[in-house]
Amino acid sequence: MQDFIQKELEAHILTTQETMKRLAPLVEEVASLMVDCLKSGHKILLFGNGGSAADAQHIAAELTGRYKKERRGLPAIALTTDTSALTAIGNDYGYDRVFSRQVEALAHKGDLLVGISTSGNSPNVLLALEEGRRIGCVCVGLSGREGGRMNELCDINLVIPSHDTPRIQEMHITLAHILCHLVEERAIA
């Protein structure tokens, strides 16, 4: 059992080191996009499936509540939380449209979308990003593996350099915390 624990922790450390080498400048760019969005009176919409849905909710909560610093709430909405909307849209239009229909209803030009998918290929995330691009939203991705189709649809896609879903998810929430810190410091300064 100790070997497994050691191996998992080492894999986490290696993924963290690779992520730091490859993505640090892009994380700063994403933070700037988020700050620009918020300072111009727009909002951030986040979405994903499973663990990525939980990450979307977590990030939205850090922004609307607070991360570390006492400040005004920032407009961020997780499109994963309204069970009535999710089930109605899923029933009437299919599960692939559960996020794109909400983007159509809630997003405006200048808003920022954050699509989260460890593969970069979740159909409902891709359709939401496509809808966001049509509207004129800034599109950001948190993905893994090679980034999938999200590479084409995102202004910036933060692709975690791993094929292991748990490692990708760990880096997503780490980068999310870094982004929340940077936004909190700069969006209300």
From Swiss-Prot:
Pathway: Carbohydrate biosynthesis; D-glycero-D-manno-heptose 7-phosphate biosynthesis; D-glycero-alpha-D-manno-heptose 7-phosphate and D-glycero-beta-D-manno-heptose 7-phosphate from sedoheptulose 7-phosphate: step 1/1. It is found in: Cytoplasm. It comes from the Bacteria. Binds 1 zinc ion per subunit. It is an enzyme of class 5 (isomerase). Keywords: Carbohydrate metabolism, Cytoplasm, Isomerase, Metal-binding, Zinc. Substrate binds at N49, G50, G51, E62, N91, D92, S117, T118, S119, S122, Q169. One of its GO terms (biological process) is D-glycero-D-manno-heptose 7-phosphate biosynthetic process. It catalyses: 2 D-sedoheptulose 7-phosphate = D-glycero-alpha-D-manno-heptose 7-phosphate + D-glycero-beta-D-manno-heptose 7-phosphate. Zn(2+) binds at H58, E62, Q169, H177. PROSITE patterns: SIS. Its cofactor is Zn(2+). SUPFAM superfamilies: SIS domain. Homotetramer. Catalyzes the isomerization of sedoheptulose 7-phosphate in D-glycero-D-manno-heptose 7-phosphate. PANTHER family: DNAA INITIATOR-ASSOCIATING PROTEIN DIAA, SEDOHEPTULOSE 7-PHOSPHATE ISOMERASE / DNAA INITIATOR-ASSOCIATING FACTOR FOR REPLICATION INITIATION. This is Phosphoheptose isomerase. The lineage of its organism: Bacteria, Pseudomonadati, Campylobacterota, Epsilonproteobacteria, Campylobacterales.
